[in-house]
């Protein structure tokens, strides 16, 4: 791995899963479980990679729709 790859990996590890709003983790987790249940996905270690990928895409769509709905208020 080149130096750029190592730096990129360190940056990702440092910043991954840091929420912008402190205390938002509970709300994010609740949203994940609600969206998963809407699609019949049981979150857990036995969930397939395919189901996780589909689920991740749906979360992204929901977040984009929420941001569009809220507009520039935040």
UniProtKB/Swiss-Prot annotation:
PROSITE patterns: SASP_1, SASP_2. Signal peptide: none annotated. GO terms for biological process: DNA topological change. One of its GO terms (molecular function) is double-stranded DNA binding. Keywords: DNA-binding. Coiled coil: none annotated. It comes from the Bacteria. PANTHER family: SMALL, ACID-SOLUBLE SPORE PROTEIN A. This is Protein SspS.
